[in-house]
Amino acid sequence: MKGTYIYKQNGIEIGRSENVITTDGKKSILQYLAGTNPDWASHMVIGSINTAATTSDKTLYYEVARSPINLKSFSSTSPNLIVKSTFEPYFAANIYEVGIYPASNSATFGVRNDLIINDFSLQSAWTDSGSAITGQWTEYLAQSPTSPRIGMYSLTVPSNKTYTNSSTYFDLRSYTTVDTLDLLLGPITTTSDPKNFTVKFTNSAGDYASLVYSLSANVNWQVKSLALTSDILNLKSISQIDITTASGLTVKIDAMKINIAAEVDETNSLVSRSIPTTPIAKIYGAPLEIEYYLDLQ
């Protein structure tokens, strides 16, 4: 079996990429063909990290959006199975990984889902001691290696600095301590390694709890993860986020999300994962169509 993703914006092809069909994916496809699995392609997903695809992949490395499959067809000539999904217009991303899941998160985990807490698209939401943050934003630019990979902006937090977002709201009551808070980070500079980066959550009652990430100098994009603690989950609903760098640490942050990937098993893990040679630009205001062609020969 082999597969190909084709990317279209406004009906025009803007790229294509070959894929790796995972070990679990082959099982899902064969079980579907045998009638023992209700579906093999339920949702298309896009992400931000271009680590090489392998047959053991169970999730994208940093999923930023998923969309239901809205068209399925069959061809008697190669390729045999064709599916299509359309991502809604109103977000921006540079896509470095793409995949297919056999089941939706809602079918597997109920109300729980990956949750993008913040992608730094709204500059006015973040302040420096109550004042607007200036000179620290990087604006989205299609396919640029320095551009945000999700959202309209990324934010550079300089040494010994706290930035605050007090106009946020999200609910943690459906999550558990096996879930993680994943940070999508760009270049990191330090005076010595490692340095602490603190994410503090506060609820409307003024109760708070923090996660402290240990960061080292790095020129590449990466994901840093820490498990949610009971103290954070006990806050229930979050109304403020503070992010703080230690002295000697400067870090670019692009997104924060809660990840439920630890609970993914072979019945709901990735069928296929692909790394485009050139990142695919998802332009704000334009839907993105992704077609997947699976050759069963």
For each of these PLM feature ranges, what is it?
Residues 1-96, 101-118, 130-132, 143-153, ...:
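Small cysteine-rich, disulfide-bonded extracellular modules of the LU/uPAR three-finger superfamily
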